[in-house]
């Protein structure tokens, strides 16, 4: 995507990090939203190896990045760098979004509420059984949400036994 508006020193920067993150649709989605809303902002994807996570998080503050989303494999490990963790993220054991407030790192998890809200919008039936493909961080959040909604049954299908 070409950023049609000139990027300046005042442009707000948001990003997603993961290993890999370059495949993420987040930049396309966010940049389209920024354009539609007339925001002076840009959203980028950065591949960040696990051993570079701490530097990436602290770099967020150093470079004035306004918000950061996280994908695999960083959602659990990043928690130790947070000054405050939202109760839901703490219960799920995973953070997928970071913002800085008053110089402090705040970690959130939007996987569970976003997924459950989407299911409810499409007529979620708690009397039905659900199949969840995958057992990573996002899947854990979705399983948590489905369990709290009282679904009849939940089947988790994964390629490996490690999760």
Residue ranges, per PLM feature:
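Conserved short alpha-helix immediately C-terminal to the canonical SAM/SAH-binding motif I
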Residues: 163
């Amino acid at each position: 995507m070409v950023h049609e508006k000139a990027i300046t020193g005042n442009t707000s920067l948001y990003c997603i990090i993961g290993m890999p993150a370059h495949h993420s649709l987040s930049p396309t989605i966010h940049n389209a939203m920024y354009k539609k809303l007339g925001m002076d902002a840009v959203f980028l994807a950065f591949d960040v190896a696990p051993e570079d996570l701490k530097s990436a998080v602290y770099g967020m503050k150093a470079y004035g990045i306004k918000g950061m989303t996280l994908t695999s494999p960083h959602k659990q490990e990043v928690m130790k760098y947070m000054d405050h963790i939202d109760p839901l993220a703490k219960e799920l054991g995973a953070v997928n979004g970071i913002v800085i407030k008053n110089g402090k790192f705040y970690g959130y998890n939007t996987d569970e509420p976003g997924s459950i809200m989407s299911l409810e919008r499409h007529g979620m039936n708690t009397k039905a059984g659900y199949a969840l493909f995958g057992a990573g961080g996002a899947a854990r959040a979705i399983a948590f949400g489905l369990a709290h909604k009282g679904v009849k049954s939940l089947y988790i299908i994964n390629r490996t036994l490690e999760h």
